[in-house]
Amino acid sequence: ISLTKLKKYEVKFNELENYVDQLRFNKQYQDSLMLYLMTEYKFRNEISSFKWIPLKKFKGFKIIGNYIVVGSKRMFISRGEFKTDKIHGRTQTEITNKLLQSDIRRHIKPLEEDTNMFLNTKGESYTNHDLSQRIGRLTEKKFGVSLGTSSINSIFISSLDKDTINKLKELSVNRGTSINVLVSHYFNDI
């Protein structure tokens, strides 16, 4: 969806977050969890390939795919197969949000470990395309526009304070560095 078309619908990021809550309330747990992961972490469609594994098995495991690793106190996402994995290598994202942890635990309870987390109505694993289609149908039904991961990311970035972003851009130019370097080196000191 083009940014111009997206502006026409004026979907706000907090509306997406509220929709996640609505899906959860309506017991559409899988849909809620998929959209939650997209809004919380801005992942692409590779969440369709997420499997889950207990932390104790993960530690001695040669990991290849994308996993949600679940321990009694710790939970994280370990991704090794995504669009830019050749550049960034395996990434690990801690899950500290208690509600998201609870949603994940509820979702994986009936699933065997090391199996795909997101299944279609036939019990088959979602593909990236299937997941994209599902998210598109959900958002079209709610907002009147089919949103994909890029649209969700655009909505998130549009929700950020423009003055702060412009100050970061200016600072990066003045210092001759990237915004990524500024964030990684200086936000840790705040």
Spell out what each predicted region is:
Residues 1-19, 85-99, 113-114:
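DNA breakage-rejoining catalytic core of tyrosine-based enzymes
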Residues 9-46:
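Basic, Lys/Arg- and aromatic-enriched nucleic-acid-binding interface segment
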Residues 25-28, 40-47, 52-61, 110, ...:
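Secondary-structure boundary elements
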Residues 50-97:
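Conserved tyrosine-mediated DNA breakage-rejoining catalytic core shared by Y-recombinases
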Residues 49, 132, 183-184:
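Key DNA-contacting residues within the recognition helix of helix-turn-helix
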Residues 162-164, 168, 173-190:
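Catalytic-site neighborhood detector that most strongly recognizes the C-terminal catalytic loop/helix
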Residues 88-156, 161:
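Active-site/catalytic core of tyrosine-dependent DNA strand-transfer enzymes
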Residues 32-39, 154-162:
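Contiguous, well-ordered alpha-helical segments that form the cores/surfaces of helical PPI scaffolds
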